[in-house]
């Protein structure tokens, strides 16, 4: 739980451009995981799918909070 709060404080400290880069990096990693999964690679860490998705959602939530849109 503390790791999530630390990540949120780090994300809130970043600029919008840094948040966009963070989202892009996580989307690239998610795409790479999907590609490895399609190739039926046995070393794919399945838990990383949800980790990257949640990181993307957290970063986008921080961006929305800055715009004043908390819920949608």
From Swiss-Prot:
One of its GO terms (molecular function) is structural constituent of ribosome. SUPFAM superfamilies: Ribosomal protein L29 (L29p). The keyword Ribosomal protein applies. GO terms for cellular component: cytosolic large ribosomal subunit. InterPro entries: Ribosomal_protein_uL29, Ribosomal_uL29, Ribosomal_uL29_sf. HAMAP family: Ribosomal_uL29 (MF_00374). Belongs to the universal ribosomal protein uL29 family. This is Large ribosomal subunit protein uL29. It comes from Chlamydia pneumoniae (Chlamydophila pneumoniae).
């Amino acid at each position: 739980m503390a790791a999530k709060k630390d990540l949120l404080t780090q994300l809130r400290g970043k600029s919008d451009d840094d948040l966009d880069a963070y989202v892009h990096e996580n989307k690239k990693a998610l795409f790479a995981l999907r590609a490895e999964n399609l190739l039926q690679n046995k070393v794919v860490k399945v838990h990383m799918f949800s980790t990257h998705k949640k990181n993307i959602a957290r970063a986008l939530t921080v961006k929305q909070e800055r715009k004043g849109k908390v819920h949608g």
